Amino acid sequence: AELTEARNLQTGTVYIAASEVALRCLLLPVLKQYRLLYPGVHIRISNHSTPQAIAALKDGAADIAVVTTPTVRSASLVETVIRPIQEAAVCSSAFPALTDRPVALSEMLDYPIISLGPDTKSFAFYSDFFTDHGLPFHPAIEAFTADQILPMVEADLGVGFVPNEFLESESRVCRIDLKEQIPERQVVLIKRKGQPLSVAARKLEHMIIDEK
């Protein structure tokens, strides 16, 4: 059996549906290690919003999905929480009034908000966050992917919300010290219930879960 498993890890393809945030905040170093261990396995990554990734998983176009909460619950899927991520409000130096003091969430409404589109769970997350504080959420600019938000903020187009991991080597934007705490999100791994993974996909699943 061990010989068969080793042989199965020399070839084959693993299909991953991943959101941009999950890719950057969790997956990339795992994939690097996986490639070092199993260079013969092909990795196919499709970049999706969370709902799109889950749809790809249900359709059989992906072996596993790695996305951020909130997710789309389904009786046919199994979800494993891997790690929390914390997001921050950011702006450029073009908005100095937001950078030198604690800022109320309501003040963000005075500036153009950059967000992902309404068909994403990120939009739903921030819509709920604003609603919970009695505020409307009407972004002025909609980005197609999460990694577009930071360049738009850098270009002085408005304010946005990005994971702390996006800011670790980023000095061209300013964190906004929000008075209200942005709720934590989770990176989760999702797979189809009752459907066995290939040896190569199962090995990657275990490596991702080991990041917990």
Give the ranges of each region predicted by the language model.
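Alpha-to-beta junction loops
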Residues: K58-V66, E87, L135, V153-V159
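Beta-alpha-beta core module
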Residues: S74-I85, D147-G194
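Central regulatory/effector-binding core of bacterial HTH transcription factors
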Residues: T11-R73, E142-A143
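Alpha-helical "hinge/linker" immediately C-terminal to small N-terminal DNA-binding modules
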Residues: A1-N8
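Flexible hinge/capping segments at coil-to-helix
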Residues: S74-I113
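A late-sequence structural motif
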Residues: L26, D177-K212
